[in-house]
UniProtKB/Swiss-Prot annotation:
Molecular function in Gene Ontology: serine-type endopeptidase activity
PROSITE patterns: SUBTILASE, SUBTILASE_SER
Signal sequence annotation: 1-24
Family membership: Belongs to the peptidase S8 family.
Domain (PA): residue spans on this chain: 353-437
Entry comment describing in which tissues the protein is expressed: Specifically expressed in root stele of the root hair zone.
Enzyme class: hydrolase
Protein known as: Subtilisin-like protease SBT4.12
Induction: Accumulates in roots after methyl jasmonate (MeJA) treatment.
Length: 736
């Protein structure tokens, strides 16, 4: 018996060891892939998860695949995420019904007077349809939310809309209410926001009006969202390490089925991906098919060209720009000269002056003076910096300032158009002012300065596109202009998580904070889209997008080449009040997008799987991508000929008044030599919802390779001005 027991024990130990070894091999050789299978089958006996498990068993040869299956997408579209080897991935990609198999990549976050700036005033000063606004649900896919924030209080709210099919699954000590009606977590951390990003974006889109808010006295005023009476559903897909593709797809799968009216998502890749490998493009397509508009951020990789993310035409892509309010932080030198820098500095040093030390003068033995001037890590001698204001030629000094004992920091800002928050007194100077500061330091035996608390300034020139905002052209669908629109995304005050850091290595905790990024611009447009939808609940996503784009303000963008063109701002700056009365709209449906994808050379077989419909990509059913009925017109030229001729075909739908006559007018862009003919030049609409088609032929020669040629087409009936940008370009020269 003893020998039997010993043998059994030994066998069990060997079995555990073997299984552990196999598990280790699987973990080492596999990675998470997403298997996208298009629309859900209409067969009554089809069970998605069973199909997914069957595929895995077939490919892996394993009867138990619980350790392989990560997620199953089964509510709004079909697919799954699983741990696969490269050979297994290849096998699955060949299976009938599979559209694409792509790695689970990690995406990144695209991180109050703004609504007043756009003309949406507080209280009774703004026209609202409160009954429908209260039935509008905005899905926020982000880092979660802080449910206790006043911005999400349900005081005065009735029960959730009857159409709501979601849940409150926020985790421990997380409670939803009649304002924050839903919460889902895909990170195993719970839906509570620990970074502040998701709380910030949610309150910008749909937060309640909260008076007397500020960041330690900076930017004092009322914080509110665009549609404060609407409901919010929070979907947490991001952690400190990023946002996984498989979680993003799962959040779309749920949000669509839960019954949201609109999705705002301030997340993306640094560069665009092909549609079938892009989780946001996939999710947004199925949202569009269900009548749900997806609004997303353009990215923060500007002003370099071709950096815009979210380039699919069924995604509303938002750039970031300034408002008329800004923050400046003055630096007063020992000689009395004042330099106006940029930061959000809440530290009050009472105007006291401290010694200045330039990084290169505090170089340690590990670095040369040039590297130390940038305040690179491990380059500074602590004894020379302690108790002084550190002066750096770049932003890296913020990471080491505290460790070397600096009392404050002044740097040459790489983004002098933006005020950033820091964990110690700071000011970022323009290159010219920084040069002046260095000259002062080098001319004095005991240079000193004071870094003052931030001041708020108004009535500055605006809107201006932020330098960080990602630029086009679109590298996936080259004839679709992206970004689509711009909105406030610089120095935005909104709700924040008390568990989050207002800046890196910051020990302070706040309920409202200031951030900049296309992440902040995106929820502004989401709020506007929801606002328009409250007046036109039957409008499709494309009609809402068109109304916003064709009524946008003209804007300015600084920089050389494409950085200052429509590739920076699309149709212009969002104008919420004008969007309520566009007159005419460019309308698209699912079939139009399928025809567009046919024109992008997707096969009939693939598109049938994606759409769930019978698709034939014949000459009759496919369209050139530039002829998609989009509110903007863009074409990339071959560049082989000095002369060119391009035609765009469009159709407008009358949503204004019956018996309307619209006349066309073309306004050429600065320096443009384009010849543009509109046929017919006049459109007559007898009834509301009537459609009329027209074509725009653009001819010219010798288009500049660095700057696109552009114009604006305006259809006007004397009351409405329906404006669409027209852009033609050859290639893009990287100006970096």
């Amino acid at each position: 018996m003893a020998n039997l027991a010993a043998s059994t024990c030994l066998y069990s130990w060997l079995l555990v060891l073997l299984l552990s070894s196999v598990s280790a091999i699987i973990d080492e050789d596999t990675q998470v892939y997403i298997v996208y299978m298009g629309s859900l089958s209409s067969r009554a006996d089809y069970i998605p998860t069973s199909d997914h498990m069957s595929i895995l068993q077939q490919v892996t040869g394993e009867s138990s695949i619980e350790g392989r299956l990560v997620r199953s997408y089964k509510r709004s579209f079909n697919g799954f995420a699983a741990r696969l080897t490269e050979s297994e991935r290849t096998l699955i990609a060949e299976i009938e019904g599979v559209v694409s198999v792509f790695p689970n990549k990690i995406l990144q976050l695209h991180t109050t007077t703004s609504w007043d700036f756009m003309g949406v005033k507080e209280g009774k000063n703004t026209k609202r349809n409160l009954a429908i606004e209260s039935d509008t649900i905005i899905g926020v896919i982000d880092t979660g939310i802080w449910p206790e924030s006043k911005s999400f209080s349900d005081k005065g709210f009735g029960p959730p809309p009857k159409k709501w099919k979601g849940v409150c699954s926020g985790g421990k000590n997380f409670t939803c209410n009649n304002k924050l009606i839903g919460a889902r977590d895909y990170t195993s951390e719970g839906t509570r926001d620990t970074s502040g990003h998701g709380t910030h974006t949610a309150s910008t889109a749909a937060g309640n009006a909260v008076k007397d808010t500020s960041f330690f006295g900076i930017g004092n005023g009322t914080v509110r969202g665009g549609v404060p009476a609407s409901r919010i559903a929070a979907y947490k897909v991001c952690t400190d390490s990023g946002c996984s593709s498989e979680a993003l797809l799962s959040s779309f799968d749920d949000a669509i089925a839960d019954g949201v009216d609109l999705i705002t998502i301030s997340i993306g890749f640094q560069f665009p991906s092909i549609f079938e490998d892009d989780p946001i493009a996939i999710g947004a397509f199925h949202a569009m098919a269900k009548g749900i508009l997806t609004v997303s951020s353009a990215g923060n990789s500007g002003p370099k060209p071709t950096t815009v993310s979210h380039v699919a035409p069924w995604i509303f892509t938002v750039a970031a720009s300034t408002t008329n309010r800004g923050f400046i932080t003055k630096v007063v030198l020992g000689n009395g000269k004042t330099l106006a820098g940029r930061s959000v500095n809440a530290f009050d040093m009472k105007g006291k002056k401290y010694p200045l030390v330039y990084g290169k003068s505090a170089a340690s033995s590990a670095c040369d003076a040039k590297t130390a001037a940038l305040c690179a890590p491990a380059c500074l001698n602590k004894s020379r910096v302690k108790g002084k204001i550190l002066v750096c030629g770049g932003p890296s000094g913020y990471k080491i300032a505290k460790s070397v004992g600096a009392i404050a920091i002044i740097d040459k800002s790489p983004r002098p158009d933006v005020a950033f928050t820091h964990h110690l007194p700071a000011s970022g100077l323009k290159a010219k002012d920084f040069k002046s500061l260095v000259s002062y330091i080098e001319s004095q035996d005991s240079p000193q300065a004071a870094v003052l608390k931030t001041e708020t300034i108004f009535n500055r020139t605006s809107p201006v596109i932020a330098s960080f905002s990602s630029r086009g052209p679109n590298t996936i669908a080259v004839d679709i202009l992206k970004p689509d629109i711009t909105a406030p995304g610089v120095e935005i005050l909104a709700a924040f998580s008390p568990n989050g850091e207002p800046s890196e290595d910051d020990t302070r905790r706040v309920k409202y904070s200031v951030f900049s990024g296309t992440s902040m611009a995106c929820p502004h447009v989401a709020g506007v889209a929801a606002y328009v939808k409250t007046f036109y609940p039957r409008w499709s996503p494309s009609m809402i997008q068109s109304a916003i784009m064709t009524t946008a303000w003209p804007v300015k963008a600084k920089g050389r080449g494409i950085a200052s063109t429509e590739f920076a701002y699309g149709a212009g700056h969002v104008d919420p009040m004008a969007a309520l009365n566009p007159g005419l709209v460019y309308e698209l449906d699912k079939a139009d997008h399928i025809a567009f994808l046919c024109g992008m050379n997707y096969t009939s077989k693939t598109l049938k799987i994606i759409s769930g419909d019978t698709v034939k990509c014949s000459k009759k059913n496919k369209i050139l991508p530039r002829n998609l009925n989009y509110p903007s017109m863009s074409a990339k030229l071959s560049g082989t000929d000095s002369t060119f001729s391009v035609t765009f075909n469009r159709t407008l739908t009358n949503v204004g008044t019956p018996n309307s006559t619209y006349k066309s007018k073309v306004v050429a862009g600065h320096g443009s030599k384009l010849s543009i003919k509109v046929t017919p030049s006049v459109l007559y609409f007898k009834t509301v919802n009537e459609k009329q088609s027209f074509s725009v032929t653009v001819t010219g020669s010798d288009v500049d390779s660095e700057v696109p040629s552009s114009a604006n087409l305006i259809w006007s009936d004397g009351t409405h001005n329906v404006r669409s940008p027209i852009v033609v370009y050859i290639m893009v020269v990287d100006e970096a």
